[in-house]
Amino acid sequence: MFEWPIGLSTGCFYRTSIFDCLEEVRAAGFNLIEICSFPAHLDYHDFDAVKRAGELIRQLNIDPYSFHAPFADHIDITSPDPTIRSHSIGEIVLAANAAAEIGVRHFVIHPGPEKSDLPEKERLHRMENAANSLNQIAEECAELDVVLILENMLPHLFFGHPRDILWILGAIESTDVGICLDTGHAHLSGDLPSVVHKLSRHLWMHHASDNCGDRDDHLPPGDGEILWEPVIRQLSKLSFGGTIILEINGNSDAETTLDGAQRARRFIRDVKRRVEDSHR
């Protein structure tokens, strides 16, 4: 039975320096991580800090599987304003360089802005801007030997539904671009029952978190209302060969957070085992 690698996003410690949490993450049994780019955690503008983070990751024998690109109100690669768009691309490319310096292989990006209620008349223009911006970013990632991965966003935002993700994927010239399925986002959009099948040919990664259906709680899988067995059955049926990254909140102390991550990892493996046993 193929075991999906299950790692942990350091985003659960986004308010804590990466230098102050990695040893605890490793001690909890996680040797594969996604790196959070929140400035208080790891400032990708500070290349001395980036280099030191890479050294520590290697010392701890951790696999830096992925790096989450920065996202904030001031970063908008779809903006009608070319100055804002250029600045946003520059920030993301800088983060991609930081990821490459650390030895990361996958660079996860929210392809749209972190703003809701954008004027409908701007939609097509913004979609075209996103395609042009992502083409530039994909080229930079290819030169850095890092794979660009697009994440489905929350339903009230651009690229919050599979149709938008598939459109932008088709508009990107590079064929070496994948998709990261965020289960929490897909559950809130109502797309989770069908999204695995729709995106299956392009799925490289899976951000796993749970919620109670009304907000993006980032609970450990199994702690919310998501029905995980159908999701895992679809992933297994379609021979998903990527990696699962637990993207849970850090609202508790480090010990409680890591206990939740360990419990979630066991939960996913137990569900997968039941699914595969039922097919024998």
What are the roles of these predicted feature ranges?
Residues 1-7, 14-28, 103-105, 159-178, ...:
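Histidine-acidic metal/acid-base catalytic patches
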Residues 1-104, 135, 201, 262-280:
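N-terminal pre-domain/capping segments
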Residues 8-9, 39-41, 75, 79-83, ...:
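Short, contiguous strand/loop micro-motifs
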Residues 12-14, 37-39, 71-73, 113-115, ...:
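Active-site-proximal loop/turn and secondary-structure-junction residues that shape catalytic pockets
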Residues 19-20, 56-59, 78-178, 275, ...:
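Active-site acidic/histidine proton-transfer and metal-coordination neighborhood
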Residues 35, 64-69, 104-111, 146-151, ...:
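Short beta-strand segments at enzyme active-site cores
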Residues 39-41, 73-79, 115-121, 189, ...:
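A short acidic, helix-capping loop that chelates divalent metal ions and anchors anionic groups
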Residues 46-52, 85, 92, 123-134, ...:
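Charged helix-capping and loop-helix junction motifs
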